């Protein structure tokens, strides 16, 4: 279904403003049911965004900095205390966040719908660190972590490993 039709339906039937309807229609990728699901989801995105920003900042600082590695380990322990479903949703959110940064880095602004709400974090400043040389490895790392968490792996170990790998990958040229 074209984005315009989904956008109109969301505005007319669910009384959304144009910007919100446009964002949801874009995220739904032509699937009206997905747009409705996104509309009624439980609002984890802001919390996920805050966790993501803390994680990425710690990973960025961790290269050659033992104190920042401790921050990554603490972050991993905090996320590991959540339920598996929430961990999986968070990792899916991270994959999409990295995808949005890559699209922005490759000048595909019309496909970017993320607008970070965390103070002093701009997608435009983050995007240059996500590029063709590291996106596949980042995606594979996050997908593998998602798989292992689904299979009841130890979340603390999995997330610590992903964090250390992210530190290496985010600095890759």
Task: Spell out what each predicted region is.
Residues 1-93, 104-113, 117-173:
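Charged, glycine-rich active-site and insertion segments that engage polyanionic ligands
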